[in-house]
């Protein structure tokens, strides 16, 4: 009976150790995927932000050049 208990304990132990190792590797893989997703999302957000800034600067530049042109015409006329 003691032999069966030890054998059962050994089988359970040998089965649980690899299972816990697999679970920790799985969690590490999921964490890496989440980090990659977060980084790609940050890149997309940064790209959208820069695009918006570029559009705004282009609009401001056009308004400034129009106003500057009007001032030059008024000064010459």
UniProtKB/Swiss-Prot annotation:
- Organism from which the protein derives: Phyllomedusa bicolor
GO biological process annotations for this chain's record?
A: defense response to bacterium
Segments carrying the region annotation (Disordered) are 24-45
**Record field: compositional bias (Acidic residues):** 30-40
Other remarks on record?
A: The sequence shown corresponds to the dermatoxin isolated from frog skin. A variant of it is present in frog brain.
Expression by tissue, per the entry, reads:
Highest expression in skin and to a lesser extent in brain and intestine.
Q: What does this protein do?
A: Possesses a potent antimicrobial activity against Gram-positive bacteria B.megaterium, C.glutamicum and S.aureus and mollicutes A.laidlawii and S.melliferum. Less active against Gram-negative bacteria B.cepacia, P.aeruginosa, S.typhimurium and S.meliloti. Probably acts by disturbing membrane functions with its amphipathic structure.
Instruction: Check the record and name the Pfam families matching this protein.
Output: FSAP_sig_propep (PF03032)
Propeptide residue intervals: 23-42
Record's keyword annotation contains Secreted: yes
* Outcome of mutating residue 21 to I: In frog brain
Residues bearing Glutamine amide are 76
Keywords of the record = Amidation, Amphibian defense peptide, Antibiotic, Antimicrobial, Cleavage on pair of basic residues, Membrane, Secreted, Signal, Target cell membrane, Target membrane
Give the taxonomic lineage as stored in the record.
Answer: Eukaryota, Metazoa, Chordata, Craniata, Vertebrata
| Compartments where located | Secreted; Target cell membrane
Instruction: Quote the protein name from its UniProt record.
Output: Dermatoxin-B1
């Amino acid at each position: 009976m003691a032999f069966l208990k030890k054998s059962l304990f050994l089988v359970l132990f040998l089965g649980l150790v690899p299972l816990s190792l697999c679970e920790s590797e799985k969690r590490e893989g999921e964490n890496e995927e989440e980090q990659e997703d977060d980084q790609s999302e940050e890149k997309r957000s940064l790209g959208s932000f820069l695009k918006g800034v570029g559009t705004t600067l282009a609009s401001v530049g056009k308004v400034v050049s129009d106003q500057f042109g009007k001032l030059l015409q008024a000064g010459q006329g």
